Amino acid sequence: MREKKFTVCLTIFVLLLFNIQKLWADSFEVKPEKIVINFTYHGAKLKIIGQGNCAGKDFIINILSTHKEKATFKKIEKVANLIWMKTGDLHFENVPFFYHVYSTRPLEEILTTKDLEDHNLTFDTLKKEVNLFPVKDENQKNFLWQEFIKYKSKYHLYAYEVVPYNCKGEGQNQVLEISIPWPYQAPPGKYQVKIYEISGKKIENIDEKIVEVEKVGIVKFLTDFAQNHALIYGVFSVLIALISGFLVGLIFKKGGH
Amino acid sequence: MYIYLPVALTSINMFLPFMAGFGVGILSGLFGVGGGWLMTPLLMMMGISPVVAAATDANQIVAASASGCYAHWRIGNVDFKLGIHLLIGSFTGGLIGVQLVKVLRALGNADVLIKISYVIMLGIIGTLMFIESLSALKKKKITKEEAPSTQKEKKFNQFLKNLPFQTYYSTARVNQSMISTILLGLIVGLLAAIMGVGGGFLMVPVMVYLLEVPMHVVVGTSLFIVLFTCIEVTILQSVMNHAVDIILAILLFLGSTIGAQIGASIGAKLRGEQLRIILASIILIVTIKMILDLTLTPSIFIAPKGGH
């Protein structure tokens, strides 16, 4: 009987704990859930909004593309001790095409190294999941991975940044707002947005949302045209170029040049 | 104003490609070169990937060379017969060159040799052209536009001229053997394919010094050749890599078609040796840039596969 009571109490406690945990989780909101790429698109702003006690807490937002990439690069090495050349192929498998981490304070001040590693929140920990080949040894793998990060960062596809946050109101009615720049380099697709709520170097809650980036209108039409009707698209591109060239020629002729 | 490029998958200030197109278009109209050596790195600086930059540049060159070719045709500077013969040669050379690259790569370290040979060759062409044009300018040979040449060159030129299948290129006003024209086109096409370049820098000196075509006709005829080469490249890039961005290309050729017209009218006001010395200077600048690219330590030690 005692054991039964204990089990019931434990179940209620766990359920209660789960609901408290979910209190934040359910109230996090990501706006917009769909980012539309039109002709004048130049990136967007992503807002993370939450309700609850946010004072004195820290937040980490990890955005990564759901699509894992298989990328082939060329190594740049000094050949014959003379010139820098693109040499052999280098394959990166199982890497997210897009990987951004935002935090309200520097990561190492918010979480322990173990937690950062367990949750894949640094570029170094991400490396463990990546299949990189061919490499001679671990040193070369580390070096090439750093170069990969540099390349991705150059095109704003990988980034780490400390962002400010707004926590307004009192007690449980506080409103949290974090604004994140969404780079225009992020291609269409689905993105997983993971929000970590942290207090005293402990993760209190993790929430996941999906943001979809989609092409619309003329941008979508032209992409589909280029992909699905490549030959007609190529001929069309040539015709437009030829017409433009001759048209400008005619205009200049009329202009008396 | 920013616009989104559907194939390049990036947003760009539309003013930038327009200005880049305008600048490269002037060079194209002036010298009859495609300008890929300048445009592709410029596009990469704007955040366009190397594959899309190279493919879209080819599409842009179609418009610029059509515009420039039309402008030169109006003033009687395009020798279509000569252009077609050189095209036959360079297309065949291109096909052989692509196969040859595969063989060379299989032998190992071919890329290094190819790169070094290209730099040396450009350097020699640029220097010789510069010296010759400078001495021509000094001597003020302005009465007749003729490409001066040394005794050795004259002997070689005579040999080329004496080959069978003689034909008269009326616009260029030169008698040449059809075999030598097609053969030289083939060599340029072969070298261009091996070195992965458009070939304008090689075709212009070949026409000036070996076929003895007047500089103004060289520019017009070279544009005619570049036009057809880039039509082929644009269609191939569309089909094989899906890498031609039509919006970016339109922005580029809005500038380059106008630039090519201006380049052609500036060129008409310059003498042959003046044009040659400016082109020689540009070839030398490109050579120096290539040497720096090859010798300076890069900022990132990996690069995406594809592109130039």
Regions found by a protein language model. Give the residues of each.
Chain A
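Short, aromatic-rich amphipathic segments at membrane interfaces
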Residues: P181, K202-V235
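Short edge beta-strand/loop segments characteristic of extracellular beta-sandwich folds
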Residues: K47-N53, S179-P181
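Juxtamembrane interface at the cytosolic side of transmembrane helices
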Residues: A241-H257
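N-terminal edge beta-strand
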Residues: D26-H42
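Bacterial N-terminal signal peptides that target proteins for export
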Residues: M1-L10
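A short tyrosine-centered beta-strand micro-motif
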Residues: G189-I195
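Membrane-proximal low-complexity regions enriched in glycine and acidic/polar residues
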Residues: W84-W182
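Sec/Tat signal peptide C-region and signal peptidase I cleavage site
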Residues: I20-A25
